[in-house]
Amino acid sequence: MENEIREKGFSGFSGNQLKIFAIIAMTMDHLASTIWPGYGKEWWLLCIHLIGRLAAPTMWFMIAEGYHYTRNFRKYLQRLFIFAVLAHFAYNFCFGISLIPFRDSVLNQTSVIWPLFLSAIGLYIYDDEKRSFPLKNWQKTAILLVLCLLAFPSDWSCFPVLCTLHIYQNRGNLRKQVLGMVAYISMYVIVWCLCIDVVYGLIQFGIIIVWPFMHFYNGTRGKGRWMKWFFYVFYVSHLVLCGILRLILHSNVTTIVGG
């Protein structure tokens, strides 16, 4: 089937194209949370949130790929950190969460860019070839636990750190990459079902829809070097716009768990 598709001129998805898909899915999901806050059970609303599950695993995958291909890890990490800081204010404004962490909750206290930043550090810690200093296995594990702890209060909690590392360590084995992500997210689903909402907890399994997109990833960055900046700029900007829309529609009301 794949060969037939490629013979018809389809060369697969570039990294930039995957980012566009993630942007679309993410925007749909965030707009839905802004316009229809809470956990509505209308089928069309659930479908929107299900499509939105494509965004996070695509980000994890692209962090792993970006780390693999980057020629300057320090600049790569600096870019992630800068936008993690900017995205914190945009994310919390978007969903009506206090800008001061842990003021009202320990969940969803900052955006997913923060654990993505920590994920990149985790990749470096476990990369014996690129890392400039030696580490024993127990030291790697200890650092990973610290990274997970730091990521815990974020959107998607510590799972971006764990899933990104799993994706990178199994690079080239798509089946293992995806099934490993699903295994990790199973723990996230359990927490959702027990503490928040069963239906929306089960929707988190929707990350599996990333499988065909990863399958047809062609390993290229794609046209437009500006995309490495556009994704982060768009991420921050769309959150600010969603926050303004939230104020217009619902006044100063929190629209997700964490506020």
Where do the protein language model's features map onto the residues?
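Alpha-helical transmembrane segments and their immediate juxtamembrane cytosolic regions
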Residues: M1-G259
